[in-house]
């Protein structure tokens, strides 16, 4: 199922990429690198187990592939996305951010923990080094961070990717795939297997998640 809740070009919304016939165990929310790359996650979702419902953030349509700064430095955009998540927070969440979308996913994850007390199961940061400002100070997140990188990608040296470790007090994993900058295409099935393994290794504690969501609405 592929549905869009966007009316105006400057709207922020969520696209439901896949919907399970029975209630899903997890929701994976994808943060693309631009407003024009959301459809990519349809092919990714087709490989995922039905226990994982996939949604993607639809950015304002004026954000293109050359507008990284609007994704990485926009507190307003992060706030708007956080507000749009409200109706989707009845299941344990994981975020998957690719390239500039990884920075934005981190910002929204930070806001989620701060405002609701409900941490993500996993924050997947793909094809992105940790911004230098993110490595200063104590860890902000408590959720697991899994960093993905392409072997030999000159734009994501592994030293910079490993710096994501400093952003969480929880577990950190680094996974490197062949394919350099385009590993997400050439290693798609391996990436999907990684997502499965990471999510299924964590038993969702619905009571704790729902308690955090209820506190937000109180």
Residue spans of the language-model regions?
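Domain-scale detector for complete catalytic domains at protein termini or as standalone homologs
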Residues: 1-218
């Amino acid at each position: 199922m592929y549905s869009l809740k966007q009316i105006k070009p400057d709207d922020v919304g969520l696209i439901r990429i896949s919907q399970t016939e029975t209630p899903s165990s997890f929701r994976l929310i994808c943060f693309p690198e631009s407003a024009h790359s959301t459809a990519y996650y349809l092919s990714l979702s087709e490989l995922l187990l039905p226990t994982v419902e996939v949604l993607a953030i639809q950015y304002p349509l004026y954000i293109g592939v050359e507008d990284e700064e609007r994704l990485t430095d926009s507190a307003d955009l992060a706030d708007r996305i956080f507000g749009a998540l409200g109706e989707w927070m009845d299941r344990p969440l994981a975020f998957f951010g690719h390239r500039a979308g990884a920075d934005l996913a981190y910002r929204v994850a930070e806001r989620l923990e701060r405002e609701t007390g409900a941490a993500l199961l996993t924050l997947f940061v793909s094809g992105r080094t940790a911004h230098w400002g993110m490595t200063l100070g104590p860890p902000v997140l408590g959720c697991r961070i899994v960093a993905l990188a392409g072997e030999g990608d000159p734009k994501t040296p592994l030293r910079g990717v490993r710096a994501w470790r400093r952003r969480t007090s929880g577990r950190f994993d680094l996974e490197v795939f062949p394919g350099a900058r385009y590993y997400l295409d050439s290693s798609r099935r391996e990436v999907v297997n990684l997502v499965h393994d990471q999510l299924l290794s964590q038993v969702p504690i619905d009571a704790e998640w729902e308690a955090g969501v209820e506190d937000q609405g109180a």
